[in-house]
Amino acid sequence: MFCDYLIQILTARVYDVAQETPLEYAPNLSARLNNQLLLKREDMQSVFSFKLRGAYNKMVQLPPDILAKGVIAASAGNHAQGVALAAQRLGTKAIIVMPVTTPQVKVDAVRMRGGAVVLHGNTYDDAYSYARELEVEKGLTFIHPFDDPHVIAGQGTIGMEILRQYQQPIHAIFVAIGGGGLISGIGAYVKRLRPEIKIIGVEPVDADAMSQSLKAGHRVRLSQVGLFADGVAVREVGEETFRLCQQYVDEIILVGTDHTCAAIKDVFEDTRSILEPAGALAIAAAKAYAEREQIEGQTLIAVACGANMNFDRLRFVAERAELGERREAIFAVTIPEQRGSIRQFCECIGNRNLTEFNYRIADEKTAHIFVGVQIQNRADAVKMVETFEAHGFETLDLTDDELTKLHLRHMVGGHSPLAHNELLYRFEFPERPGALMKFVTSMSPDWNISLFHYRNNGADYGRIVVGIQVPPHEMQDWQAFLDHLGYRYWDENKNPAYKLFLG
């Protein structure tokens, strides 16, 4: 099978629709990493991602009579545009089943390329199941987004281009993993010709289906999947892609949301282009790898695999990028409620730039300060904590606390003497009409909402934090509500920031 993929990649038909994208030097990132970082700019394709390669290579090889009947696909994003463009170029019809939660900009992009959009279900799994039903009902050919040899071979042409474009030593190639089609194709080609090059996969920490599968030795289906990097939000990897990754992937690096946002900013500073979160994963991993391995003078290649970014997500990315780069730290500091305390606190900060400063009296003796400070590195933040505490100011470092970053820094208020039996939970729910109403109406009318915060980040999924007063004897009913709701949730009742500012 190894040689079969080599031949399939060498003979893949992708250049009717795809361009050979440049392999660009990233000067700022390279200087910071003390290594040469090259970006494979798949974000420069006409559909702003690599997906048209595999889709076209699959469809162009269908028998004419089969192709004439049309194709169908399920996708919430880049694969949909690739299939629509390929169908348009080949003169056939394409039906794309997309979840009803799909942002309008992506629906419009598919329609602009001639695809007939069918909105069905709330998740990719719902859309996939319905697409397979329509496949049989209408006699169409299903174009899988990753688990198909022709799709894998089409994506593998990226590996072929990389080795042709850069013939000097390469330490590692970093590739984002969703279902695994991209890294399988690149790995199958590169490892055949240059086996010394490391193939390193990248997944979000909350969408790590391939990482878990490789550790388990079999495919693992995730019960929940994070959606910030929606282009790789896959619950279960492909059967063929899993087999290929077992053979060709050297390791998988997991990256968090903040580091992904920082990578988006890094690429913007080097190229003035904005990648989508999935498109920036490889860059985030290359940075983490270089720091972990303490390497210098090596050539690292990161596949910038997509740029279908919703504009209204940029606010969230900008806020979290500084945290991902360790250029901002967030602290909760308790100071004495007396004259001169704030001045003494500010003297501890010195000449550092503040990103925010919130002060609230807590009681007769103490007050709480929520402060964001620009820092040079993580060691700088540790030093600040030591300085605060040396002056007798009790300090919490909240830089890595999700509740703080998503909600508390945007909230006002304080402790309420009326919030008896309050429970605090974070929820993630689809951004669709009626989703919030479902949440509220599903609760018992006997439960009082004592705290609520929602902020639209321009993503397919929204995030809320809710304080709900539930009597102790109704805790079993509360757990049943959580289980029935079907949304991801996090228990934040023991969160120190909540206890300090709101609990």
Question: Over which residues does each language-model region extend?
Answer:
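PLP-dependent amino-acid enzyme catalytic core
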Residues: 1-435, 439-503
